[in-house]
A protein has these predicted regions:
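Generic N-terminal segment detector
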Residues: 1-15, 22
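Active-site pocket-shaping loop/turn-to-helix segments
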Residues: 11-16, 62-81, 127-136, 154-169, ...
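Conserved beta-ketoacyl condensing-enzyme motif
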Residues: 6, 21-23, 27-159, 188-197
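Active-site-proximal alpha-helical scaffold in enzymes
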Residues: 76-88, 140-141, 145-189, 227-248
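Active-site-adjacent elements of ketosynthase-type condensing enzymes
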Residues: 41-51, 107-111, 190-216, 258-272
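Condensing-enzyme catalytic core mediating Claisen C-C bond formation in acyl metabolism
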Residues: 3-7, 27, 32-34, 211-272
Length: 272
């Protein structure tokens, strides 16, 4: 089995839109949770979310890519730009040996909601021909592959909250068995919309706290649900010997991955 290392990382997050910004904010204890600003909240039990702020996709992407993409794909492309740039794999790895595994729990939900509203208001003939390509759950992976000319395996995993971890783990396995030399992998989400917040809120999954510092409390007896967030995280994984041979900076090594299902309930964990 091949050894697998990390040679690039990039992110768009509620506390920073680059790895450097994110790291500094994380170590400083910055909280990315605040009152939802994207829409009015007259009937919502949940009023807080972790929104991406001060985000300028034009700093990394051209206007055409931005115009044709849902926000979740834009986040993914920007994070991938940073990760791939850091890794230096373009021109150093055969394009046929570069794969993309970028997943999303829901996909282009902003596009889904806006085009549904457009159809109800203006009729079916006014639905954008870009609706389906912008909305589908594999378009972030596909767009990333096109953007970098990556011609290896391209798969979009969807495993709810575990999506990014699944994509990274499966990318690790792909390199382990020799299916690729390098993998651009991770996940992206952009679902802070009225419908998504209402849906998660009404299933009592979201925190109803009004204090941002007391809203997200995992593994705490005071916990009351999760806080909706958004953004993207992307890694470049590479076969160890190849990374060493080209003098790449190695950030970390992936040494294991596994996945199971308790086959118990859609949302509740197995109590045993």
């Amino acid at each position: 089995m091949n050894r697998v290392v990390v040679t690039g990382a990039g992110c768009v997050t509620p506390i920073g839109n680059s790895l450097d910004e994110f790291e500094k904010a994380l170590y400083a204890g910055k909280n990315g949770i605040g009152k939802i600003t994207r829409f009015e909240l007259p009937d919502y039990k949940c009023t807080l979310a972790a929104e991406v702020k001060d985000f300028d996709p034009a700093a990394r992407l051209d206007k055409n890519a931005i115009r044709k993409s849902d926000l979740y794909t834009i986040y993914a492309l920007c994070a991938a730009e940073e990760a791939v740039g850091m890794s230096g794999i373009i021109g150093r790895v055969d394009p046929e040996e570069i794969g993309v595994y970028i997943g999303s729990g829901i996909g282009g939900f902003n596009t889904f909601c806006s085009e549904h509203e457009n159809m109800l208001k203006n009729g079916a003939r006014r639905v954008s021909p870009q609706f389906i390509p912008k909305m589908i759950g594999n378009i972030a992976a596909g767009s990333t592959a096109i953007h970098f000319g990556a011609k290896g395996p391209c798969i979009a995993h969807t495993t709810a909250c575990a999506t990014s971890a699944t994509a990274i783990g499966e990318a690790y396995r792909a390199i382990q068995v020799g299916a690729a030399t390098a993998m651009i992998c991770g996940g992206s989400e952009a679902t802070i919309t009225p419908l998504a917040v209402a849906g998660f809120g009404n299933m009592q999954a979201l925190s109803t706290a009004t204090d941002p510092d007391a809203a997200s409390l995992p593994f705490d007896k005071r916990r009351g649900g999760f806080v909706m967030g958004e953004g993207a995280g992307v890694l470049v994984l590479e076969e160890y010997e190849h990374a060493v041979a080209r003098g790449a900076e190695i950030l970390a090594e992936v040494v294991g991955y596994g996945t199971t299902c308790d086959a118990q309930h859609i949302t509740a964990p197995d109590p045993t």
